[in-house]
UniProtKB/Swiss-Prot annotation:
Record gene name: glgB
NCBIfam families (alphabetical): branching_enzym, PRK05402.1, PRK12313.1
Name of the molecule in the record: 1,4-alpha-glucan branching enzyme GlgB
Keywords assigned by UniProt, alphabetized: Carbohydrate metabolism, Glycogen biosynthesis, Glycogen metabolism, Glycosyltransferase, Transferase
GO molecular function: 1,4-alpha-glucan branching enzyme activity; cation binding; hydrolase activity, hydrolyzing O-glycosyl compounds
Gene3D superfamilies documented for this protein: Glycosidases, Golgi alpha-mannosidase II, Immunoglobulins
E.C. numbers: 2.4.1.18
Keyword Transferase: yes
Lineage of producing organism: Bacteria, Pseudomonadati, Pseudomonadota, Gammaproteobacteria, Thiotrichales
Swiss-Prot/TrEMBL catalytic activity: Transfers a segment of a (1->4)-alpha-D-glucan chain to a primary hydroxy group in a similar glucan chain
Stated role: Catalyzes the formation of the alpha-1,6-glucosidic linkages in glycogen by scission of a 1,4-alpha-linked oligosaccharide from growing alpha-1,4-glucan chains and the subsequent attachment of the oligosaccharide to the alpha-1,6 position.
Species whose genome carries this gene: Francisella tularensis subsp. holarctica (strain FTNF002-00 / FTA)
Length: 640
């Protein structure tokens, strides 16, 4: 098995070692020989096609090179008893479209299939694979990759901008190409102060409305936006602007369209044999058989493909709960317990551990993030310590609790104060990312601004308050596109964001400015990210002031030289002469205030320093007396 950390060769032939590791489930570069590859055999240039179909009777390759006719010379030959098939076709070339005609050995029924390992595919509704051998690109991101390999993301800033390429911006109603995006996206993300962009799935999928989460071409770059070189150029440009690239990745299930992986050889192949495990009724997809060696190779090699070929810096693994639980989204009687009588998917657990183990060993500095909605333990604990091995986990509990809280009338918030404080009870159990993702602004859930309580002024103030509280809360950050300039309608994947409102309305322009300033503040203050997962980095001042719906806490840097005091007022009431305990004697200065006039607030700011007095309050020996603006987050800093 070739240990490969660079782009694929123009010529590569399958060897005995490749075959052995593939069937053992240990090949992590299967894309180097599976699929369609340029080859020279007996002095003749052509393409070698290889696929896996253990229950096939025959497989014929048809395409542009043979006028889509089934011909004897284009039938694959079995090269192992375990289902590997291969054929060399001399006149096939780069750019030719093709498919596999797969005949089942039991029924003699045949199906037309796209190549599971194809690097490029036709734009929907067409479904043919496309021979793609010209994928070489000269990268210019060496400095970024060197820095990435040395970075400890736990004690560095991470502020992620989640993005759906098809609807971020369009041009005359048409998708932007990767090259067109390269001209605007990196600059925008850099100017806004985000450290990473997270792309929703970029592999080929037939249905736009699936957002990429029901893929058919796991190795095929989304053809809506261009080709492989274009995507590489976009990633390169992002890296040269010091922006990391995270990719949403879907290893749990796949689309059931007939040209895809479903019943690839006429019988369960990539999916489980048992219908209770294979069929995902909730999403109308099929679940991967994660205990099958060749399927594990397909998926882990796919992760390696995106990381090696496109220099992806991290994978956000979608729907981890669906991988972990046999009874996920199933009623009693619709699932079969494991060998120990439990609901845990033992094969799924082993797969996730193996995936994370491989990436940790081979891809220095690449991170994995779990989207997991249950309380499964040790998701972000290293594999060698008994965990699943992810670097981070989305904090779905924090998201649900706080969005519920912020939608309440402030009159009633006092009765639900735990919703805004409970997250710190379990925060240190995982390496959490606080995420306000695409899932929260669709399907009737309302846009982020419309989740806020009150009239228009209070909605804007509530959004600024909430986002400032989020920046202060321990954990890395993620927000979905459009929220930064206050899109009022829910996200619609079929049209671009409503960018025009920034030019039309001052309130939208002010909020965009607020997000930029907030992101800059986060990036510049070590206390906000250096100790996200260390108890030293956070301390409550007062978590129990439910009557006034005020939170106050301290964020500290590792060396304790930086301390920030957050005061979050979740009511539309101004509090005068508010006594607050502080850890140190001295003078305190306001360093951020979400009520600032330049953000659209009421302008109740602290223009002068506040001096502490030696009076006990909130368990501290010193206290300050301040005015707290309505629906606002105030941040103070000890200056001397």
């Amino acid at each position: 098995m070739k240990n490969k950390n660079s782009e694929q060769n123009t010529h590569y032939t399958i060897g005995e070692q490749d075959i052995h590791y593939f069937h053992e489930g240990k090949h992590i570069y299967a894309y180097e020989f599976m699929g369609a590859h340029k080859a020279c055999e007996e002095g003749i240039e052509g393409i070698r096609f290889t696929t896996w179909a253990p229950n096939a009777k025959s497989i014929c390759v048809i395409g542009d090179f043979n006028y889509w006719q089934v011909e004897d010379k284009n039938y694959m030959e079995p090269i192992t008893d375990a289902g590997l098939w291969s054929v060399f076709i001399p006149n096939a070339k780069n750019g030719d479209k093709y498919k596999f005609v797969v005949t089942n050995k039991d029924t003699s029924h045949y199906v037309y299939k796209s190549d599971p390992y194809a690097f490029f595919s036709e734009l929907r509704p067409n479904t043919a694979s496309i021979i793609t051998t010209e994928t070489q690109y000269t990268w210019s991101d060496d400095k970024w990759l060197e820095k990435r390999a040395k970075t400890n993301y736990y004690d560095n800033p991470m502020n992620v901008y989640e993005l759906h390429l098809a609807s971020w911006k369009t041009k005359n109603g048409k998708f932007l190409t990767y090259d067109e995006l390269s001209e605007t996206l990196p600059q925008y993300i850099k100017e806004m102060g985000y450290t990473h962009v997270e792309f929703m799935p970029l592999h080929e999928h037939p249905l736009d409305a699936s957002w990429g989460y029901q893929p058919t071409g796991f190795y095929s770059v989304n053809s809506r936006h261009g080709d492989i070189i274009g995507l590489k150029r976009l990633v390169d440009k992002l890296h040269n602007n010091d922006i990391g690239v995270i990719l949403d990745w879907v290893p749990g299930h796949f689309c059931k369209d007939q040209h895809g992986l479903i019943y690839f050889d006429g019988s369960p192949c990539y999916e489980y044999q048992e219908p209770t495990k294979a069929i995902n009724k909730g999403w109308e997809t099929h679940n991967f058989d994660l205990g099958r060696n060749e399927v594990k190779c397909f998926l882990i090699s796919n992760a390696m493909y995106w990381i090696n070929e496109f220099h992806i810096d991290g994978l956000r693994v979608d729907a981890v709960s669906n991988i972990l639980y046999l009874n996920y989204d199933r009623e009693d009687g619709q699932w079969i317990p494991n060998i120990y009588g439990g609901h845990e998917n033992l094969e799924g657990i082993a797969f996730l551990k193996e995936l994370n183990g491989v990436l940790k060993h081979t891809c220095k500095g690449v991170i994995t993030i779990a989207e997991e909605s249950s309380s499964w333990p040790d998701i972000s604990t290293p594999v060698e310590k008994g965990g699943l091995g992810f670097d981070f986990k989305w904090n779905m509990g924090w998201m649900n609790d706080t969005l519920r809280y912020i939608s309440l009338d402030p009159v009633y918030r006092k009765y639900h104060h735990n919703l805004i404080t409970f997250s710190m009870v379990y925060h240190y159990s995982e390496k959490f990312i606080l995420s306000i993702s695409h899932d929260e602004v669709v399907h009737g859930k309302k846009s982020l601004i419309n989740k806020m309580w009150g009239d228009l002024w209070n909605k804007y103030a509530g959004l600024r308050l909430y986002m400032s509280y989020m920046i202060g809360h321990p954990g890395k950050k993620l927000i979905f596109m459009g929220s930064e300039f206050v899109q009022f309608v829910e996200w619609r994947e079929y049209e671009q964001l409503q960018w025009q409102v920034v030019d039309q309305y001052e309130s939208h322009k002010q909020t965009l400015h607020f997000f930029k300033k907030l992101n800059d503040f986060y990036h510049n203050e070590t206390a906000l990210w250096q100790c996200d997962y260390d108890h030293h980095g956070f301390r409550w001042i007062d978590a129990n002031n439910s009557q006034q719906s005020i939170l106050s806490f301290i964020r500290s840097s590792k060396d304790n030289k930086q301390k920030l005091i957050f005061i979050c007022n979740f009511t539309p009431v101004t509090y005068y002469d508010y006594h607050l305990g502080v850890p140190d004697a001295g003078s305190y200065k306001e360093v951020f205030n979400s009520d600032n006039l330049e953000f659209g607030g009421s302008g109740q700011v602290m223009a002068t320093e506040i001096f502490s007095s030696p009076q006990s309050s909130h368990g501290f020996e010193q206290r300050i007396t301040i005015k707290i603006p309505p629906m606002a987050t105030l941040v103070l800093k000890l200056i001397k």
